[in-house]
Amino acid sequence: MPVEKIQIRRDYVLQYMVNNDYSLNQLALEIGVSPATLSRVLNGERRPGQLVIGKMLHYFNLKFEDLFYYDFVDKSQ
């Protein structure tokens, strides 16, 4: 049975960090999340919750589909 999993467009965030010379800690502080949370979301270790999604969309001034996407995971295997 496929389950939707929200994923971040990691390449966008990493390129933003390079372009703006931001460390992960600096970006997390700007967004308003902990560095550990941002790291885990970017590495796919944690799904972003509503609060993190909202803060990131607000910070980047993007629509959901521009920063996140749905990945379908088969839970039956």
From Swiss-Prot:
CDD domains: HTH_XRE. It holds the Pfam family HTH_3. It is found in: Cytoplasm. Residues 24-43 bind DNA. Keywords: Cytoplasm, DNA-binding, Transcription, Transcription regulation. SMART domains: HTH_XRE. One of its GO terms (molecular function) is DNA binding. Residues 13-67 form the HTH cro/C1-type domain. GO terms for cellular component: cytoplasm. This is Uncharacterized HTH-type transcriptional regulator YvzC.
